[in-house]
Amino acid sequence: CALAARTGRPLLFLCDSERSATQTMEDLSALLGGGVSLLPAREITFYQDVAASREVAYRRIEAMRKVLSGDARAIVAPADALLHRMMPREAFNRNTISLRVGDVTPIDQLIERLLAAGYTREYMVEGKGQFSVRGGIIDVYPADALSAVRIEFFDDELDSIRAVDVMSQRSQGNM
């Protein structure tokens, strides 16, 4: 898209339905070779399906992260998606946790940041938005990630970050 390249900003495509937005996203991804995200609409129901609403929230967070990081060339959304406000950039950046091997971060401080960002502490990580703690090891399943990660500490120094299979709870290799 020449317009996106000229402005340096992602394009926003509005569609009349979620189905149309999904199809448009797939078509644009094929045309542009990737870099297209779907911003889903929140479902408004009288009963709350917690799992479904969390998944939509995670997909909205992923789309926002891609826009703010410059990874999105285009965003496709049903018009209903724009009826709900997004988190302000400052709040999003404040709740984003970036870690690298060698960082010095007290484990307790990381746990507090995860809780403040809306993660739930569990015995075992099974899904997005969860984390668990065992000694100097923290497993986290980020909202916008394809898999969980295992963060190992030696005292307060981050020693390794590895992908984790949530089914077996085994680490799969360094990231």
Feature-to-residue mapping (PLM):
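ASCE RecA-like P-loop NTPase motor cores
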Residues: 1-175
